[in-house]
C-alpha cells in the first residue's frame, strides 16, 4: 500500500477534529498512542493510526455508532467491530492508499488525560508519563511483531520523559525493575534484521539508516541506565 504522508496526516486531523467537535462523544474519548505522541509530545516519526481510551463504558454503544458516522465521511469503512477489549475500525480513504485503523480501548488502567489544543482543536490527551508506561508495555507484549514500539520507547527514554510505574506494574504483574530487566532480555534476543519491521515506512531515510545500525543497542543501553537509577 502507498503512504502519502501529507494526505494521510490531513485525514487523521479531520477525523480528530470531527470527533472532538462532537460533544456527545468528545468527553468520553482519551486520545493516546503514536499519533497523539507525534502531535503533542514531539515524537519524530510519522504515525498512521488513531488510538483512544473509552472513558465511560456506559457510552460504548453511542460512541461506536458515532465513530462510524465520522469515519464514513472520509471513505469506505472496511471494518467496524466490537472486539473483546476494544472498538475497532478500518477506513480506506483511497484505492491503494494506506488504511487508517481506529481503535478505542475499553480496558481501564487508571490513565490520566488533560485538555490540549492542536491547530485550534481541543482534545483530551493522555498525560506523557502514562503514555510512556503503555508504550513500554506495548513493546514488551509485541516485541518481534513490530518495532514501532521499540522506536517509541527509545524516544521517551532519550528525551527523559517520566514514566508511571504503577501502570507498568499493574499491567505486567511484575515490579517495575523486573519488567525493565525482561525488556532488556527481549531486546538482546531480537534480531537486527527485524528492527525496521512495522516502523521503516514511518521514518526518513536517515532515520532508517540510524535505526538499522543503532536502535536496538541504544534502547538496551538507555533501559539499563534507567534500571540502574532504580537501585
Where in this protein do the model-derived segments appear?
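Structured mid-to-C-terminal alpha-helical surface segments
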Residues: 1-29, 43, 55-57, 61-231
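Glycine-rich loop at the start of a catalytic domain that most often binds anionic cofactors/ligands
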Residues: 41-47
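Acidic Asp/Glu-based divalent-cation binding sites
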Residues: 51
Amino acid at each position: 500500500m502507498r503512504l502519502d504522508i501529507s494526505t494521510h496526516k490531513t485525514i487523521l486531523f479531520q477525523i480528530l477534529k470531527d470527533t472532538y467537535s462532537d460533544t456527545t462523544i468528545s468527553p468520553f474519548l482519551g486520545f493516546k498512542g503514536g499519533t497523539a505522541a507525534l502531535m503533542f509530545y514531539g515524537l519524530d516519526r510519522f504515525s498512521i493510526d488513531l488510538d483512544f481510551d473509552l472513558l465511560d463504558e456506559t457510552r460504548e454503544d453511542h460512541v461506536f455508532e458515532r465513530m462510524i458516522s465520522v469515519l464514513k465521511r472520509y471513505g469506505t469503512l472496511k471494518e467496524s467491530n466490537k472486539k473483546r477489549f476494544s472498538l475497532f475500525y478500518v477506513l480506506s480513504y483511497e484505492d491503494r492508499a494506506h488504511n487508517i485503523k481506529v481503535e478505542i480501548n475499553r480496558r481501564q488502567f487508571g490513565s490520566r488525560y488533560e485538555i490540549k489544543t492542536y491547530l485550534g482543536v481541543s482534545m483530551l490527551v493522555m498525560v506523557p508519563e502514562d503514555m510512556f508506561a503503555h508504550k513500554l508495555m506495548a513493546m514488551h507484549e509485541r516485541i518481534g511483531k513490530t518495532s514501532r514500539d521499540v522506536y517509541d520507547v527509545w524516544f521517551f527514554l532519550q528525551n527523559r520523559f517520566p514514566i508511571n510505574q504503577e501502570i507498568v506494574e499493574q499491567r505486567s504483574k511484575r515490579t517495575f525493575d523486573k519488567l525493565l530487566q525482561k525488556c532488556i532480555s527481549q531486546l538482546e534476543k531480537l534480531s537486527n534484521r527485524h528492527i525496521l519491521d512495522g516502523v521503516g515506512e514511518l521514518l526518513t531515510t536517515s532515520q532508517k539508516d540510524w535505526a538499522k545500525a543503532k536502535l536496538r543497542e541504544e534502547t538496551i543501553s538507555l533501559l539499563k541506565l534507567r534500571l540502574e537509577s532504580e537501585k
